[in-house]
């Protein structure tokens, strides 16, 4: 193996954008983010409720039908 060609492997802190919990991982990346972690994901918490978020298309169609009714 050639010396000095491999990226630096270091510990980085990832913060969950949902629950703001911090996790430490080893990575070659300088910065990274996580939307849902094991602390707040329904699979790991045992929460059986379905969380549905409306996307852009659903919001657009809702606004379109609302404006057509006027």
Curated annotation (Swiss-Prot):
Any one Gene Ontology molecular-function term assigned to this protein's record: rRNA binding
Keywords: Ribonucleoprotein, Ribosomal protein, RNA-binding, rRNA-binding
Keyword rRNA-binding applies: yes
Cellular component annotations (GO), alphabetically ordered: ribonucleoprotein complex; ribosome
Source superkingdom: Bacteria
Entry keyword Ribonucleoprotein: yes
UniProt cross-references to Gene3D superfamilies, sorted A to Z: Ribosomal protein L31 (4.10.830.30)
Example GO BP: translation
PROSITE patterns reported for this sequence: RIBOSOMAL_L31 (PS01143)
InterPro entries named in the record: Ribosomal_bL28/bL31-like_sf, Ribosomal_bL31, Ribosomal_bL31_A, Ribosomal_bL31_sf
Membership in a protein family: Belongs to the bacterial ribosomal protein bL31 family. Type A subfamily.
Quaternary structure and partners: Part of the 50S ribosomal subunit.
PANTHER family in UniProt: 50S RIBOSOMAL PROTEIN L31, CHLOROPLASTIC, LARGE RIBOSOMAL SUBUNIT PROTEIN BL31C
Described purpose of this protein according to its UniProt entry: Binds the 23S rRNA.
Listed name of the protein: Large ribosomal subunit protein bL31
Lineage start: Bacteria, Bacillati, Mycoplasmatota, Mycoplasmoidales, Metamycoplasmataceae
Gene: rpmE
């Amino acid at each position: 193996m050639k010396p000095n060609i491999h990226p630096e492997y270091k510990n980085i802190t990832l913060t969950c954008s949902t629950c703001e919990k911090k996790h430490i991982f080893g990575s070659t990346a300088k910065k990274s983010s996580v939307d849902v972690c094991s602390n707040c994901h329904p699979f790991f918490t045992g929460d059986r409720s379905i969380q549905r978020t409306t996307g852009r298309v659903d919001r657009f169609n809702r606004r379109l039908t609302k404006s057509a009714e006027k």
